[in-house]
């Protein structure tokens, strides 16, 4: 029986988290990739929200469930729940703000502490449209990504440059890990929650088996 017989419109569901300092453009990257929208009056995200987009890889429908949260210190309490079950992560910085790039070390460390070692990770230098204000050299970021085995792309949520590429490369990397069994089948059933990568009416695909816990997004006020 196919997934369509159960009312699902996908074969696999991947949980991906966006991390990085507040104001680097995480919310607009999310809305650009999932809805092809950009909000010029973007404000810092309050709480957590997610959006989805479905892609096809090797004839399989992959639904990416992408989570976004604010980067301010006062929201660090949600860290463990936010990362739990994630099979992919994108660390985002603003190419015109060196401090946001310097803090990528912190975000990577926090990810490593809260997620499995096999989680697929990409580094995004956002706001490439502000090249005239560049404070972070591309080569420096490339070197950091190579040293830490991260995917790397510079993007512009404003004009869409490389946004699809960044997300699609990460999703493809996750799919390859699943195909090579670097990510194991857990015991949880897919129910639309945030428990990682899952198959309709079947076991959750996650880096390590996790209990079936329902996660809810709080304060869905993102721009």
UniProtKB/Swiss-Prot annotation:
Q: Which Pfam families match?
A: Ras (PF00071)
Chain spans, region Disordered = 185-223
Enumerate the residues binding GTP: 20-27, 68-72, 126-129
The activity regulation comment is: Alternates between an inactive form bound to GDP and an active form bound to GTP. Activated by the guanine nucleotide-exchange factor (GEF) TRAPP complex, and inactivated by GTPase-activating protein (GAP) GYP3.
Q: Share an example GO biological-process annotation for this protein.
A: vesicle-mediated transport
Position of sequence motif Effector region: 42-50
Lipidation sites, kind S-geranylgeranyl cysteine, are: 222-223
**Free-text function comment from the UniProt entry:** Required for protein transport in the secretory pathway. Probably involved in regulation of secretory vesicle formation at the trans-Golgi compartment. Plays a role in autophagy.
Query: How does the annotation summarize its subunit structure?
Result: Interacts with YIF1, YIP1, YIP3, YIP4 and YIP5. Interacts with TRS130.
* Name by which UniProt lists this protein: GTP-binding protein YPT31/YPT8
Q: What is the species of this protein?
A: Saccharomyces cerevisiae (strain ATCC 204508 / S288c)
> Which gene produces this protein?
YPT31
């Amino acid at each position: 029986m196919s997934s369509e017989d159960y009312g699902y419109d996908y074969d696999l569901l991947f949980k991906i988290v966006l991390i990085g300092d507040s104001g680097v453009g995480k919310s607009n990257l999310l809305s650009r990739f999932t809805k092809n929208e950009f909000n010029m009056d973007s404000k810092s995200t309050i709480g957590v929200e997610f959006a989805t987009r479905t892609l096809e890889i090797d004839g399989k429908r992959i639904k990416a469930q992408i989570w976004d949260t604010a980067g301010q210190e006062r929201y660090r309490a949600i860290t463990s729940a936010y990362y739990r079950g994630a099979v992919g992560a994108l660390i985002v910085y603003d190419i015109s703000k060196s401090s946001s790039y310097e803090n990528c070390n912190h975000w990577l460390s926090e990810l490593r502490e809260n997620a499995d070692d096999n989680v697929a990770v990409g580094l995004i230098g956002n706001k490439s449209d502000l090249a005239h204000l560049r404070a972070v050299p591309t080569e420096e970021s490339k070197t950091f990504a190579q040293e830490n085995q991260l995917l790397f792309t510079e993007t512009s949520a404003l004009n869409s440059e490389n946004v699809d590429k960044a997300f699609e490369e990460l999703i493809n990397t996750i799919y390859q890990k699943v195909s090579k069994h670097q990510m194991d089948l857990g015991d949880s059933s897919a129910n639309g929650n945030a428990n990682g990568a899952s198959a309709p009416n079947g076991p959750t695909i996650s880096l390590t088996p996790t209990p079936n816990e329902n996660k809810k997004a709080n304060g869905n006020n993102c721009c």
